[in-house]
């Protein structure tokens, strides 16, 4: 089972990726994680990626693709994998497809978790975190007993900069520009499947399991 996971920020991809990985016994490959691992281990590609990042530049596709390719050739990917955070563009998707075709491991499913923008805004802008113990809350879905105060240590709750409305809208705009062409690419290839990400975690995972079960 070889899967690409797509969806906007705040769609719950991380939660679902963990559940998919456990149920179907395939590694969850997050591009952020493998970048950090390559940089930490000082691999040739990691050193090159760090050089661009230290200069405030985007890491070129050939470096990113090289890091992903290297990870996909590991033994734990023999029976499948779940890719999260890559590809981000059609050019990256084409390069990935060419590589996978060459090793007879073509993608089975591009799984899209669909969530309306207004739902994501409510979900992300409502998040609050304790300045002291790090406990997480949500002003609507998981509110503290006393507004603005942590239930555990009574310290102040704050909204992280990443969760402000302006930041969330900016991230959604970037996602739309990058990912809509990618969604159409996988639609044209006939491998995209969509699930409603506004349902509960269990309901979303149940729908995902049905899709992946069909494609096994």
Swiss-Prot record:
InterPro entries: Adenyl_kin_sub (IPR006259), Adenylat/UMP-CMP_kin (IPR000850), Adenylat_kinase_CS (IPR033690), Adenylate_kinase_lid-dom (IPR007862), P-loop_NTPase (IPR027417). It catalyses: AMP + ATP = 2 ADP. Disulfide bonds: none annotated. One of its GO terms (molecular function) is ATP binding. The keyword Membrane does not apply. Zn(2+) binds at residues 130, 133, 150, 153. Pathway: Purine metabolism; AMP biosynthesis via salvage pathway; AMP from ADP: step 1/1. Residues 126-163 are annotated as: LID. ATP binds at residues 10-15, 127, 136-137, 199. AMP binds at residues 31, 36, 57-59, 85-88, 92, 160, 171. The keyword Nucleotide-binding applies. Consists of three domains, a large central CORE domain and two small peripheral domains, NMPbind and LID, which undergo movements during catalysis. The LID domain closes over the site of phosphoryl transfer upon ATP binding. Assembling and dissambling the active center during each catalytic cycle provides an effective means to prevent ATP hydrolysis. Some bacteria have evolved a zinc-coordinating structure that stabilizes the LID domain. Catalyzes the reversible transfer of the terminal phosphate group between ATP and AMP. Plays an important role in cellular energy homeostasis and in adenine nucleotide metabolism. This is Adenylate kinase. It comes from Clostridium botulinum (strain Loch Maree / Type A3). The lineage of its organism: Bacteria, Bacillati, Bacillota, Clostridia, Eubacteriales.
């Amino acid at each position: 089972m070889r899967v690409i996971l797509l969806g906007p920020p705040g769609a719950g991809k991380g939660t679902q990726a963990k559940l998919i990985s456990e149920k179907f016994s395939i590694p969850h490959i997050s591009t952020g994680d493998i970048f950090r691992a390559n940089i930490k281990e000082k691999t040739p590609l990691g050193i090159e990626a760090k050089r661009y990042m230290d200069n405030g530049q985007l890491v070129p596709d050939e470096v990113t693709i090289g890091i992903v390719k290297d990870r996909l050739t590991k033994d734990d990917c023999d029976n499948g994998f779940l890719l999260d955070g890559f590809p981000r563009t059609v050019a990256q998707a084409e390069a990935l497809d060419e590589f996978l075709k060459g090793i007879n491991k073509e993608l089975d499913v591009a799984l899209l978790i669909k969530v309306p923008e207004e739902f994501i805004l409510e979900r992300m802008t409502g998040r609050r975190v304790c300045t002291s113990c790090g406990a997480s809350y949500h002003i609507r879905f998981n509110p503290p007993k006393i507004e603005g105060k942590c239930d555990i240590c009574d310290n102040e709750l704050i909204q992280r900069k990443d969760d402000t409305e302006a930041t969330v809208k900016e991230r959604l705009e970037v996602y739309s520009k990058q990912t809509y062409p990618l969604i159409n690419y996988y639609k044209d290839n006939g491998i995209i499947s969509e699930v409603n990400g506004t349902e509960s975690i269990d309901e979303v995972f149940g729908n995902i399991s049905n899709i992946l079960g069909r494609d096994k």
